[in-house]
Amino acid sequence: MKKVLITGAAGFLGSHLCDRFLAEGFHVVGMDNLITGNINNLSHLFPEKHFEFYHHDVSKFVHVPGDLDYILHFASPASPIDYLKMPIQTMKVGALGTHNLCGLAKAKKARLLIAST
């Protein structure tokens, strides 16, 4: 079974990607720091055998145990209001988060998709 890490998993796009990849037969690892994401977007997935969630900030070192085939990096505050309230956090997720996930992708030999606004 293929395994995918989805960052920003508790956000609008991330939560829908979690749903979709589970429906397609993937093992899904969701990751979110829950600063702007809402855990209720994922609550229906917690009973799923092939879903796991990590409450983690990707601007810090990222570790996911085991193999990893794909990384979808969707973590970021998602609106101009959030950017104004959290400019440093927004830049850290974009720069350090992307750097950390590139390192994870290299270590795991995983394919990486980076979404950005």
Positions of the model-derived regions?
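N-terminal Rossmann-like NAD(P)+-binding domain of SDR-like oxidoreductases, especially those catalyzing
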Residues: 1-117
